[in-house]
Amino acid sequence: MNYNIHPVTYLNADSSNTGTAETTTQHHHGSKKSPSSDIDVDNATSPSSFTSSQSPHINAMGNSPHSSFTSQSAANSPITDAKQHLVKTTTNEHKPAAFTPSVGQQPASQTNTTAPQSYTQPAQQLPTQLHPSLNQVYNNQPSYYLHQPAYGYQQQPLHQEYNQQPQQYHDHHGYYANNNNIPSINELNQKPPAPVKPFKKTYKKIRDEDLKGPFKCLWSNCNIIFETPEILYDHLCDDHVGRKSSNNLSLTCLWENCGTTTVKRDHITSHLRVHVPLKPFHCDLCTKSFKRPQDLKKHSKTHAEDHPKKLKKAQRELMKQQQKEAKQQQKLANKRANATTASDLQLNYYSGNPGDGLYDEASRKRRYENNSQHNMYVVNSILNDFNFQQMAQPPQQPGAVSTAVSSEFTTKRMKSGSEYNIDVFNKLNHLDDHLHHHHPQQNPQQYGGNIYEAEKFFNSLSNSIDMQYQNMSSQYQQQNPGVASFAQQKPAQQTNGQLYPSLPTIGNGSYTTSSSSSHKEGLVNNHNGYLPSYPQINRSLPYSGVAQQPPSALEFGGVSTYQKSAQSYEDSSESSDDDDDDEDDDDYSTSSEEELDALFDKLNIVDKNVEEVTIDGFNLKDVAKHRDMIHSVLVYLRKQIEQQEKEKSQEQKDDVNQLYPTITAF
């Protein structure tokens, strides 16, 4: 009776199915197992559980339903289904033909549709190629078959062949195996190796010791020794490099396996200078020598005057000092522009202000050169401003006599009085500003008969200005008795007409016993009414009844309190030669420049204590300026009168010498 069917079919089984079960179990006579192995739960998952229910041992035990149900459950488990292909392959090797049920058993086999079909259907199919993930299950599960005594041992060689078949299949096609043909992701992510840089040739730098010799030829196998590098160089060029005309030209350098190859003979001979300590090109200005002429030409530029390396530190300091002096002179000139005294006025007053910002250097030089023409323009401007322009245009036609007389009469009425008042003061100030801004050139004019009237007018105006100036000065002294008179501080005139005051000449005698009164007056005038004083020597002098000697007669060994100890020359020379102390020297030069700026700022020709004096609306400084302006016009007019008188006297002499008088037509 067959119990390898569904449990419901087992209940309806009869004795007719017994023959079928016995026939099925005849093919498994080679495997013998104990009954306890069929009931074991661990063996239920093994492939041997498929055939254990059909073994003779189970049939001898009366076909227990427990064992039949256990084998049936093991046959339907998922693990058994996954291993079913391998088991069927093993059974096909032992069976000569496929199992075919008899005709009498067809109703029973049709009723059992699940288990027999799942067991017999893989027998008609060949092993198919599985995915590699499933193939790992078979490769990693050989332990189930090794524990079987005969059944597993017979299956083991076939199992290895079966495992080798997918591996050979993958190796042949190369789809899934990670072989050398397909790079991995790590290999793709790796950076390509850096290119190897070619070997750079380095050459030995020639030193002075290398130029002493002897010199050995290192060309290939040549070992000739020479005394001078010139002979070695000629040997290389003639014997080793050769010439094309001699059919021995070699353009490859073989000096210590150098291997440099050139195209022309000139190139290889120029390359040989790298190996030979030869410097035939010498500098005429220094002791340096060079291998190539272009190197010498490049070096010669460093000896140019405008090259930065040529300028030593002392020269750079000298240039800075010159620039600083020019800057300080400009500052001093600007300050002197506000220090114009009355003694500077006369005819040279309007020659231009040296420090005035309105004038450039060229125009200022031109005014100094053309001083006479500029003075002529000043005089003409003053005369025109005081309505004396008609006297420079004498009548040339007879019909114009009445017009000239009437215009002269009108001019006389238009002229202001010769008294110096506030109107004349404002007019001269306006004229002063106009002359400082505009300087057109005018031709000298010949004055007519009115030149005497002009001279008389400006003479009276000059006298009026002098009186006003003296009255204002005395009034200022009365208001400020402790202040010296403005006339003494600023001398009115100087007969020599110099732009700068002359220095005093100090004699060997004492100050009290002067040789002449004129010498003493000159000292007083040049030093604002007091005798000059000098810094005292910082040491005690022996007292004697005789008057002390002037400072010029003293020895020059003392140190004044106004002097400053100088630095030693050696320290300055050493610091100038040292180029590493440039920054410190720059700081020192900057501080010294600032000190010089402060000292120059303190210099001023004008006494700061002298304030602007204004009395009754008149500025005392402007009054002195106007006095010099009128005086310059008066001097010029007197020169013109003198010149005209000379011309008239010459004409009278010529008229006396003539035999016949001339007749003038009206």
From Swiss-Prot:
A motif (YPX[LI] motif 1) lies at residues 500-503. Residues 45-56 have a biased composition (Low complexity). GO terms for molecular function: DNA binding; zinc ion binding. Transmembrane segments: none annotated. The keyword Repressor applies. Activated by C-terminal proteolytic cleavage by signaling protease at neutral to alkaline ambient pH. A motif (YPX[LI] motif 2) lies at residues 534-537. Residues 571-593 have a biased composition (Acidic residues). A zinc finger (C2H2-type) spans 215-240, 251-275, 281-303. GO terms for cellular component: cytoplasm; nucleus. Residues 591-660 form a coiled coil. A motif (YPX[LI] motif 3) lies at residues 660-663. Residues 1-77, 96-122, 294-347, 474-527, 560-593 are annotated as: Disordered. The keyword Nucleus applies. Keywords: Activator, Coiled coil, Cytoplasm, DNA-binding, Metal-binding, Nucleus, Repeat, Repressor, Transcription, Transcription regulation, Zinc, Zinc-finger. Residues 12-24, 61-77, 102-122, 337-347, 486-509 have a biased composition (Polar residues). Belongs to the pacC/RIM101 family. Transcription factor that mediates regulation of both acid- and alkaline-expressed genes in response to ambient pH. At alkaline ambient pH, activates transcription of alkaline-expressed genes (including RIM101 itself) and represses transcription of acid-expressed genes. This is pH-response transcription factor pacC/RIM101.
